[in-house]
Amino acid sequence: MSLWLEAPVPDVSPDSAVELWEPDAQDASSQPLGSSKCILREESSTPQSAGDTSRMGLEAPEPTALLPGVEAPPESTELRPQKRKKGPAPKMLGNELCSVCGDKASGFHYNVLSCEGCKGFFRRSVIKGARYVCHSGGHCPMDTYMRRKCQECRLRKCRQAGMREECVLSEEQIRLKKMKRQEEEQAQATSAPPRASSPPQVLPQLSPEQLGMIEKLVAAQQLCNRRSFSDQLRVTPWPMAPDPQSREARQQRFAHFTELAIVSVQEIVDFAKQLPGFLQLSREDQIALLKTSAIEVMLLETSRRYNPGSESITFLKDFSYNREDFAKAGLQVEFINPIFEFSRAMNELQLNDAEFALLIAISIFSADRPNVQDQLQVERLQHTYVEALHAYVSIHHPHDRLMFPRMLMKLVSLRTLSSVHSEQVFALRLQDKKLPPLLSEIWDVHE
């Protein structure tokens, strides 16, 4: 779960720590969930024992059949970036000026009214991770002349105007969009009756290696979920106080959701260690991938627990949370609504355990994550899982050509949700709200 909660946070000891990477940790079940800290960087401090704390996870949803015979439902509406004000971008009158350099604007690019030049400059800078240096102290006035002279001040002005880096699609996201468009065109082309001379279509098949990998992923997920059952009683219970607005009730709700988030993060770490190829990466790349994919995997797991009838999400056994419960815990509506919309859209796909496990693996092995060193190897690993998912979906959804691109586009939607999550965590920091050490470390919230 996400942690930009507005209720006061119980005191957390900064000295207690749990090393999620240590396989032979001692028992520390007596420690409270919120007091554990995940040491994600190479540090000289000695981590304390983790014990059962590193074995926690959310309740497993009812397992679905590995070989479903249910045909996928029609295409659902994709999640789109949500702003505080709903509705389409204002219509252009033709005389608008670029918010960065004052040139003639061509439209709204990356959340800002800007010209084609500043649009392209911002995109190139973000994709390349460019670092510019101003030779005039960083205070150049920006206009159509200076935009060509000082790139640092131009990039700063882009950000000050409101351009959002998360709106820039990576090469992989562009490739996924192109793939979806091609799949749609192929589906339309093949919707006509086939000619008599057309050769029979050859469906892809799962190789023995792919089948073994999928079986291992499903077994690993089920094992991680089973480990969480004995730890569910340690989560601070949802308050049933007569006064739901009392300080004590707000603190309980905050602790409840933060501890659920800790449980989820630790389960993600356990599962990632079981992914073929993950432990062969450097420790630094393992940490970089986990820190930036954790919230996306948490949201995927959340969508598995969505109940369309009651529009609620079940985390603990026999306890469901609706939108109002999320709000009572301190989450803001700008994030609550996208969570439920994404969960509803995922539920309509009716994915089984194998498809969820492959999607999670693809999300974790994203080479464009910050601070990833061996990007080529991460891309190779991700490609292995993408190919396995494509073959699996083609076999189990032979009459739905759009199922595979639909599933991959959900990962693009997750990037949007992840950016909203980052904004909320940053807002929490500005409000001087303290997260438990594990969540502060995984989301880079440093005091």
From Swiss-Prot:
Region entry Disordered, spans: 1-88, 178-203
Entry superkingdom: Eukaryota
Subcellular location, principal: nucleus
This protein's GO CC annotations: chromatin; cytoplasm; cytosol; nucleoplasm; nucleus; receptor complex; RNA polymerase II transcription regulator complex
Biological processes, Gene Ontology terms: apoptotic cell clearance; cell differentiation; cellular response to lipopolysaccharide; cholesterol homeostasis; hormone-mediated signaling pathway; intracellular receptor signaling pathway; mRNA transcription by RNA polymerase II; negative regulation of cholesterol storage
Start and end residues, zinc fingers (NR C4-type): 98-118, 134-158
Subcellular compartments: Nucleus; Cytoplasm
Domain NR LBD: 209-447
Region (Transactivation AF-1): 1-96
Listed Low complexity bias regions: 187-203
Listed SUPFAM superfamilies: Glucocorticoid receptor-like (DNA-binding domain) (SSF57716), Nuclear receptor ligand-binding domain (SSF48508)
DNA-binding region: 95-170
Post-translational modification: Ubiquitinated by UBR5, leading to its degradation: UBR5 specifically recognizes and binds ligand-bound NR1H3 when it is not associated with coactivators (NCOAs). In presence of NCOAs, the UBR5-degron is not accessible, preventing its ubiquitination and degradation.
Keyword Metal-binding: yes
Single Gene Ontology MF annotation: nuclear receptor activity
Positions of region (Transactivation AF-2): 205-447
Keywords associated with the record: Activator, Cytoplasm, DNA-binding, Metal-binding, Nucleus, Receptor, Transcription, Transcription regulation, Ubl conjugation, Zinc, Zinc-finger
CDD domains documented for this protein: NR_DBD_LXR (cd07160), NR_LBD_LXR (cd06954)
Self-association state and partner proteins as the record states: Heterodimer of NR1H3 and RXR (retinoic acid receptor). Interacts with CCAR2 (via N-terminus) in a ligand-independent manner. Interacts with SIRT1 and this interaction is inhibited by CCAR2.
Function: Nuclear receptor that exhibits a ligand-dependent transcriptional activation activity. Interaction with retinoic acid receptor (RXR) shifts RXR from its role as a silent DNA-binding partner to an active ligand-binding subunit in mediating retinoid responses through target genes defined by LXRES. LXRES are DR4-type response elements characterized by direct repeats of two similar hexanuclotide half-sites spaced by four nucleotides. Plays an important role in the regulation of cholesterol homeostasis, regulating cholesterol uptake through MYLIP-dependent ubiquitination of LDLR, VLDLR and LRP8.
Stated family: Belongs to the nuclear hormone receptor family. NR1 subfamily.
Protein name per its UniProtKB record: Oxysterols receptor LXR-alpha
Organism: Bos taurus (Bovine)
Gene designation per UniProt: NR1H3
